[in-house]
Amino acid sequence: MNSYDVVVVGGRVAGGSTALLLGRAGARVALVDRSRAGTDAVSTHALMRAGVLQLSRWGLLDRVVAAGTPAIRSTSFHYADGSTVRVAIRPTAGVDALYAPRRYLFDRLLVDAAAQAGVDVFTETAVTALRYDETGRVRGVRAMDRSGRTVELPASMTVGADGIRSTVAALIRAPVIRQGRFRSAVLYRYITGVLADGYQWAYGNGAGAGLIPTNDGQTCVFVSTTPERMRGLRRYGAEHAFTELLVQAAPTLRDPVVTATPAAPIRGWGGVPGYVRRCWGAGWALVGDAGYFKDPITTHGMTDAMRDAELFAEAMLDATAGLPEAVALARYQAIRDRLSSQLFAATEDVAAYDWTTDRVQTLLRRVSSAMGDEVEHLQALSDRRLTAPAWTS
């Protein structure tokens, strides 16, 4: 039975990034995911500057571009008063464009890079229990593969990077230290035949929308509102709800979207209120949505996941270099919470859908300021520690 330094549960953005960084640093890592490799996920796809910065530092941005992911060089904001504000993406922190890769491509890219770094990848394998030692410290996981065979994966550290419905967080009973009140109900679809000019975000009459250019010449379009309003509109069908919310969010976007060619059926998501969980303990940690989730209306989830993966990897390298593990992991949580606090609060207010134009513009400026702090922190991290072996067992 192989024993690992770290077992990472979850093979999406948070888990793939965590496994990749620790594998490159020289740790013995197992990555476990219940899904098949390369499966898609409901997502807004949009990476913000911090996420693109990390891809560049990790040497993966060229792969995203080579896959045909279009460069995003502007962002437009449409408001309920009929105004539109267009902002060019200025070259900053080595980033001159943003990207929104499809999840079947991006998640697979991260996991493949992790495997190239020496990570053992177990797909179609679901965690069923945690392993503990006599002191109560978590010591890996017990899982079941698709054939029903039990797989034992002992490890010094177990990471839950398995999303909103995290098995690891549930088994640990990780405490919630901050709870949101609001949630978006969202409809997503892909269309072709529309060349969106960069990211398009709309904040209209109690409804939001976004147009996000992605791979294969497609554009991801989402509309969102409160769950109560969505339920009322969906009584008349998903198409009716989609079009009505698009009109309420941004009337000028209606015609180009509804006359485009659908590339996939409409998919819905009922939403989950945001939360912040304690993200570490004896032998365990949480990364990404497993530990911290905010409403998707501000389209920052993938960037959150990559950021927290790197913060956690830095903490683990500090611990292997001699810093007490509890101190290193407490620092990880403190930095995560500092960088997330303003994003969480502003997103919570946007997800109430009770904004005026002036109010939502103020909230979006707060989001932008918090994203600037995030970029500044990531720029200060050392590339060397996460691109060359630095792990000491």
Regions found by a protein language model. Give the residues of each.
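N-terminal FAD cofactor-binding segment of flavoenzymes
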Residues: 42-80
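C-terminal helical "tail/cap" subdomain of flavin- and related membrane-associated enzymes
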Residues: 259, 314-393
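Predominantly flavin-linked oxidoreductase catalytic cores and closely associated redox partners
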Residues: 113-252
